[in-house]
Swiss-Prot record:
PTM (free text): Ubiquitinated. Proteolytically cleaved by the proteasome in response to transcription stress; the resulting N-terminal form constitutes the activated nuclear form and the C-terminal portion is degraded.
Key words, A-Z: Chromosome, Cytoplasm, DNA damage, DNA repair, DNA-binding, Nucleus, Telomere, Ubl conjugation, Ubl conjugation pathway
Composition-biased stretches (Gly residues): 641-654
Record's compositionally biased regions (Pro residues): 277-286
Annotated protein name in UniProt: RNA polymerase II degradation factor 1
Source organism (scientific name): Candida tropicalis (strain ATCC MYA-3404 / T1) (Yeast)
Length: 769
């Protein structure tokens, strides 16, 4: 996207020169305007601003008719045209549009368009400008760049016909306006109605095909692909004419198209339409013009075939000459017109199916593709278009095949972008979901293997750049949040950097794994327990083979949690819950219960004489802390060692440790940290304020490692006597803030303090949930 947007911004600037409307358009707005030509740029801008500039949300809203265009007085002119257009486009915008275009619709309809459009010729083209704010890049800009040849209003030549094309209110109409601009008089005059009718028939056939495609392919995609072909055909055909003019205009016109979201999707189809253009290119510019006119005219003729009748026969020879090339073009144009008409009504619908084959409606990717492809534009893209023009639908179907081309085009784009944007580019959309789920569980080798089946890119992304996976699976929030965890599982706290007080690994224990899915927020940490349902798996995945890790990684979270709970029930009994579910046992802290550490809290935690405890503990606790810190939460031995030392002093054994966590961690705000062993926290910032000597040793073991623990023990010993606020002061005042931060990694500390043997999940549930 970024690459595309950059170039596209430049393009938009370039094209905005002609139209003030698009001058301020964002990339999203530009894309929307191209995709929904019948929408006013300002309306689309409003939608974007209301939806955080989320292109996808706005497209979804529009395509699913969740929002409707305002029809203010300001648009009455527009309304007239639209009404007429809608009359023609009423059924699908595409089918009736092509029908009317193909002269199926009575010429009277077309004529009224011509009539009304001459009236609103100035209005309609501007509307196109608005509706096509981005089409300005494509259709309008092509029109304006053609302006040198014919004014955008094309009033110079035949505003009526030009307007007639807009009457479709479709992207094709916009293009046809452009086409008539250059060849309006000549083309409309030159092309006989017969040719228009042929075009109409082709258009109808293609339209039907297009309709099928629309059914099969998202309207938007089809619209963009087909419309852009027309656009490019028109613009490119104009471009050949313009080739005499600066090439930039050619490039500019196609460029916005390809630069445009639609063009990105359309590039292959666009190539087909450009096909006649190359002939004009090879031919003298006049033939180019003729063909352009012809190309334009097929669209115009479809819409204005009868008006053309009186005028057109003169050019019949010319047209007939170019018709062989044009017919494929015209059919694409007709298709584009019908598709455009249809897509105007249901632009996204067409796009999606095609995009499935092609990139999913991921605009960025297709745009990128287009950028790669379309920036050259002019003859190059025209040739390609000529290739595709012959088989526009096949390519739509074959767009997977054409995707290689797009891929080549996109080669400029990082493959990662493609992957990011959607895994969309691949038919892998389904896979994408699987991948997301799997990627959520990716790290399980089984799924990785399965994914290997998917795409190398996906595998690479999943395994190697988890971040990329996050990007790819942009909305797989679990992946984003949890993929980081495997590294962090060692540091239960670090995973949730924000919650110093909680040892989430305890949650992973899933004392209440089945209790509620919510409980598994922590399970997501995939703490040491290795459970946590799908989430724990991220961290643990290869590590544990819980039922939660069953090969069916895509189990619902509940299933996983339940399975994990079952597994955990055994584990939990075996393992002490290092802490009640990852939250410190506040009960113990709040109440001096010797069982729960009354020694720790009452005696040490709050002004209770901790000195003996701390002194006794600290040496060992520093050692134990070092062990624990390194060993990490699950090492009961370290905790027990500390506990042993503490026990001697406290008489409560590990309970000091137990209370320490709260103290050193300040697990509960404001608690132990000030009085507790902040003395140890004197240790430096490393120790949490609440750590207290024991806590500090533990926290040190957690955050700082043994060295901190040792320091904390020595400082804690010193500060023991200075316990309480003095300890805090001695703790260097850093202690309260820093310790919390450092303690955060120490969540494991709870596990480190297995001595809290009381950690029966039942104790905690009442208060907690």
């Amino acid at each position: 996207m970024s690459t595309f947007r950059k170039s596209y911004k430049n393009q938009s600037k370039r094209f905005n020169n002609s139209h003030s409307n698009s001058s301020s358009t964002s990339v999203e707005l530009t894309n929307l305007v191209e995709m929904f030509p019948d929408w006013e740029a300002d309306e689309l801008q409003g939608l974007l601003s209301e939806n955080d500039n989320s292109l996808e949300i706005v497209i979804d809203l529009i395509v699913n008719n969740k929002v409707s265009k305002w029809e203010p007085i300001k648009k009455e002119k527009h309304k007239k045209k639209e009404k007429e257009t809608e009359d023609h486009n009423s059924s699908t915008n595409g089918s009736t549009n092509s029908a009317s275009t193909s002269s199926t619709a009575p010429s009277s309809d077309r004529k009224p368009y011509n009539k009304s459009k001459p009236q609103s010729s100035s209005t309609r083209p501007p509307k196109k400008q608005h509706a096509n704010a981005n089409y300005k890049k494509g259709g309008e800009k092509s029109a304006e760049k053609p302006k040198p040849t014919s004014t955008t209003s094309s009033t110079t030549t035949t505003p009526v016909q030009k307007e007639t094309t807009p009457a479709t209110n479709s992207w094709a109409a916009a293009l046809s306006n452009d086409k008539p601009k250059k060849s309006v008089a000549t083309t409309e005059e030159s092309e006989p109605v017969e040719h228009a009718e042929e075009d109409g028939a082709k258009a109808q056939q293609e339209e039907q095909e297009t309709v099928a495609e629309l059914d099969n392919t998202t309207t938007t995609n089809g619209e963009q692909q087909e419309q852009q072909p027309e656009e490019e055909t028109t613009q490119e055909s104009q471009a050949p004419v313009e080739q005499a003019k600066p090439v930039l205009k050619e490039a500019a016109i196609p460029e916005p198209k390809q630069g445009s979201w639609a063009s990105a999707i359309t590039p292959k189809t666009v190539k087909p339409k450009a096909k006649p253009a190359p002939k004009p290119v090879s031919q003298p510019q006049p033939p180019k013009e003729e063909e352009e006119k012809e190309e334009k005219e097929p669209v115009v003729e479809e819409q204005v075939s009868e008006p053309v009748e009186s005028i057109a026969e003169e050019t019949v020879a010319e047209v007939s000459q170019s018709i062989p090339s044009e017919e494929p073009i015209e059919s694409p144009v007709a298709t584009a017109t019908t598709t455009t008409a249809a897509t105007t009504t249901e632009p996204s619908i067409v796009e999606q199916p095609q995009q499935q084959q092609q990139p999913q409606v991921v605009l960025p990717t297709s745009q990128q593709q287009v950028n790669s492809v379309g920036i050259s534009f002019g003859s190059l893209s025209i040739q390609e278009e000529s290739k595709d023009a012959e088989v526009p639908r096949e390519e739509v179907i074959a767009e997977q095949t054409s995707q290689p081309e797009q891929t080549q085009q996109q080669q400029q784009q990082p493959i990662q972008d493609q992957q990011r944007y959607g895994l969309y580019n691949q038919q892998q959309t389904q896979q994408r979901y699987q991948q997301q789920q799997q990627s959520a569980y990716q790290q399980q080798p089984q799924q990785q293997q399965q994914q290997n089946q998917y795409s190398k890119q996906q595998q690479q992304q999943q395994q190697a750049p988890i971040q990329q996976q996050t990007a790819q699976q942009q909305y797989d929030y679990y992946n984003q949040f949890q993929q980081q965890y495997p590294q962090q599982t060692a540091q239960p706290g670090a995973q949730f950097g924000g919650y110093p007080g909680f040892d989430y690994s305890g949650y992973n224990q899933q004392a209440f794994a089945a209790a509620s899915p919510a409980a598994n927020h922590i399970a997501t940490l995939g703490g040491s327990a290795g459970v946590g349902g799908g989430y724990g798996q991220y961290a643990q995945q290869a590590g544990s083979t819980d039922s939660s890790h069953s090969p069916i990684t895509n189990q619902s979270t509940l299933q996983q949690q339940q399975a994990a709970a079952a597994a955990l029930n055994a584990q939990q009994q075996q393992q002490q819950m290092p802490t009640p579910f990852g939250y410190p046992a506040y009960y113990n802290y709040y109440y001096n219960n010797p069982y729960f550490n009354a020694g720790g809290l009452g005696s040490t935690g709050f002004g209770a004489p901790q000195q003996g405890n701390q002194q006794g503990q600290q040496p060992t606790s520093s050692q134990g802390a070092s062990q624990q810190g390194q060993a990490q939460p699950q090492v009961p031995s370290a905790g027990s060692q500390q506990g042993g030392a503490s026990m001697g002093s406290n008489g409560f054994g590990g309970q000091q440790q137990y209370y320490n966590p709260n103290q050193f961690n300040n697990r509960y705000p404001g608690y132990s940290y000030p009085p507790q062993q902040q003395q140890q926290q004197q240790q430096p910032v490393q120790q949490n304020a609440g750590q207290s000597q024991q806590g500090s040793s533990q926290s040190a073991s957690n955050s700082e490692g043994a060295s901190d623990g040792q320091q904390s023990s020595s400082q804690g010993q010193q500060g023991q006597q200075g316990q309480g606020p003095q300890g805090v002061q001695q703790g260097q005042g850093q202690q309260p803030p820093v310790p919390q931060q450092h303690m955060m990694p120490q969540y494991g500390g709870y596990q480190q303090y297995p001595q809290y043997g009381y950690q029966d999940s039942n104790q905690y549930r009442g208060g907690w949930y």
